[in-house]
Amino acid sequence: MGAPTLERAGFEHYEVAGDARPGKRCRHNLKYWQYGDYVACGASAHSKVTLEDGTIIREARFMQPESYIKHAEKDSAVAHERVVAKEEQAFEFMLNVLRLREGAPLDLLTERTTLSLDDIQPGIAKAQSLGLMPQPLNRFVTTDKGWDFLSDTQEIFL
């Protein structure tokens, strides 16, 4: 119901949960959806940092400001830290890039993960066989059906 109204007002539905006028997309969120790195600052903040060797580290800061400050003054305000296993990278990558209606270039996979296109080919083939991703695949993008069933499309890469 709201989509036609937004479209008539000049908005484009560029992200699964985001609309904007041309040239006015949220650059902050695009960093996430393109599986880029970001550094946490402040209580409850999260980081995704890729090291030179390709290791992807996720961190979460303490949630409550008092706890965050107490830990930051002592040593570190990091409440949780984990390395994203290679087996998780395909899902994390697709969870993010497929949120964008235009998807992402194929080379972004090797640029932002330790995976190759061959590593995720079984998932791509399954998504294509279900009509969720196009054939041939020139970008990581969904078909209209894949967009309508985005969670199902992303789940294939779990």
List each model region and its residues.
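C-terminal scaffold of the Radical SAM
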Residues: M1-L115
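A short, conserved structural fragment
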Residues: E15, Q128-N138
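Short secondary-structure transition/capping segments
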Residues: R25-N29, L130-G131, D148
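Short amphipathic alpha-helical interaction segments
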Residues: T114-S129
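Minor-groove-contacting beta-hairpin "wing" of winged helix-turn-helix DNA-binding domains
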Residues: R139-D144
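Short, amphipathic alpha-helical interaction segments positioned at domain boundaries
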Residues: K145-L158
